């Protein structure tokens, strides 16, 4: 009797189990496109930033944290490449980095972090309650993964939500898309009234 099919089946089951074990929990469905999303947060200077204050602008929202070891720098680097590829159209966009870790991401830390990727990226924060409301509004999950001592990671959603000039969810982009595809998507949204 050959044990090869049994071994292959066990390996596949083990990999599937690992994938489920490390999958984000408590996921919230992403909101449907087309609806305006009210929210209220603060920038790193303490200024109020709301959905209404951003009307008339095409907004790129990314939720992450400064201590993120891999996904956040990758996605913010992607946002920066897309912004550079937009050329002069970049002036008509507002890229925002919203923290999922207000405990460690102080306004001072955020102020120095976001522009490292691109000078147009502004960081936003808020109280845990304000952030939880924004997470719910945009279907973002974020939870602390305990580590040793004060070291921990955040398990969070990772996509870039694009809002049109009326504050409606118009698209979702991310580093799995080509730069050209995201630029085309943004230019289409920028061209719409």
Kindly give the residue locations of the regions a language model identified.
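N-terminal targeting signals for export/organelle localization
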Residues: 1-38, 42, 192-193
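Short loop/turn microsegments at loop-to-beta-strand junctions
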Residues: 36-37, 59, 157-158
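A short beta-strand-turn-helix
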Residues: 39-59, 83-86
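Short active-site neighborhood of thiol/selenol oxidoreductases, capturing the structured segment around
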Residues: 52-75, 79
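Hydrophobic beta-strand anchors of alpha/beta hydrolase catalytic cores
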Residues: 60-61, 95, 160
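Structural microenvironment flanking redox-active thiols in thiol-disulfide oxidoreductases
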Residues: 74-134
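Thiol/disulfide oxidoreductase modules built on the thioredoxin-like
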Residues: 130-185
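C-terminal alpha-helix
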Residues: 185-192
């Amino acid at each position: 009797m050959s044990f090869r099919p049994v071994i292959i089946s066990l390996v596949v089951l083990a990999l599937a189990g690992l994938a489920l074990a490390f999958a984000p929990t408590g996921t919230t469905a992403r909101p449907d496109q087309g609806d305006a999303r009210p929210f209220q947060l603060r920038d790193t200077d303490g200024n109020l930033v709301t959905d209404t204050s951003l009307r008339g602008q095409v907004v790129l929202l990314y939720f992450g944290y400064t201590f993120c070891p891999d996904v956040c720098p990758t996605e913010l680097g992607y946002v920066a490449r897309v912004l550079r590829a937009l050329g002069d159209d970049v002036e008509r966009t507002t890229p925002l980095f919203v923290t999922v870790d207000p405990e460690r991401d102080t306004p001072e830390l955020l102020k120095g972090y976001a522009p490292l990727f691109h000078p147009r990226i502004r960081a936003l924060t808020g109280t845990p309650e304000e952030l939880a409301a924004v997470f719910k509004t945009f279907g973002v999950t974020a939870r602390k993964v305990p580590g040793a001592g004060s070291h921990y990671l955040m398990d969070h959603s990772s996509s870039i939500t694009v809002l049109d000039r009326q504050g409606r969810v118009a698209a979702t982009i991310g580093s799995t898309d080509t730069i050209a595809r995201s630029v085309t998507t943004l230019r289409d949204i920028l061209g719409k009234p």
